[in-house]
Amino acid sequence: MLHGSIYPKSLARLAAYTAALAVSCAALPGASAQQPDSLNLQQELLRLGEAATELEHTLPSFTCQESALSQQLKNGKVLQGVQFVATLRAQRGADGKLDESITITSVNGQPFTNGHFHLPVFVSGGFDRMMRYFAPEGQACYRYSLAPGRINFQALPGPDTPTCKDSGTVGFALLDAAGNATRVERRVDQAMAKPRKEAIYAADDIAPIELNGHSYRLAHHLYAEMPAGKEVGAFTADYAACKLFTATVTISPATPAHDTPAAPPE
């Protein structure tokens, strides 16, 4: 879901998250007494893996309205903030990757047509990447555990490799009664996030959206934080009115050819 991960906002939340992580590490599958839990975990990973594959490979091009707030924070105080509204387009390119672009329509409540302005931070990639922690080809890179209403994940220790690229990442997904993800959060150790240009914390709230007759689970709310020296860039975005994106092609009338006199009959 974009580059990012979990950054607790209070000591109480940090304590709760640490407790959940302790449960995650203690509940590894393997012992015979945990076989039913292990089976349920594998079923859940299969479900989430299918959702991740859909987003990465079959999610069609689409467009949404993005309403966002970009802030520069220091010691919890806002140093700078910019609000904007934009038309977001996520288009699948010839290489199969989903590329996001935006056309900004208003800045701080005023219409915007052209020119330049400074955003403290901008975050993208929260649609096709938010479920990548459950992609089938990468599940061997993580340690998972299942708890009521959630699944925890933690990247296995060790340096990044071409297959496992998320060292220092830990997070969880909240699940509905059917086992579908409704929220994904994760954090990345700051020392590892910086060279990878990842958010140290990111959270996506997810809801089903129908595109081209198929239901996809897409982010409708995103919050992320990026380190910037002694300051932090905070990015909040809401996505609405998402629909299938189709390019418009205008065909101009053909240039009429000069009339050629018909040859006389022989």
Feature map (PLM): residue ranges:
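N-terminal secretory signal peptides that target proteins for export/translocation
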Residues: 1-13
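Extended interaction regions within the primary functional domain
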Residues: 2, 27, 211-215
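Amphipathic/hydrophobic helical signal segments and adjacent flexible N-terminal regions
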Residues: 3, 30-33
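Bacterial N-terminal signal peptides
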Residues: 15-27
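Structured extracytoplasmic
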Residues: 33-169, 177-183, 187-202, 207-216, ...
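Aspartyl protease active-site motif detector
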Residues: 173
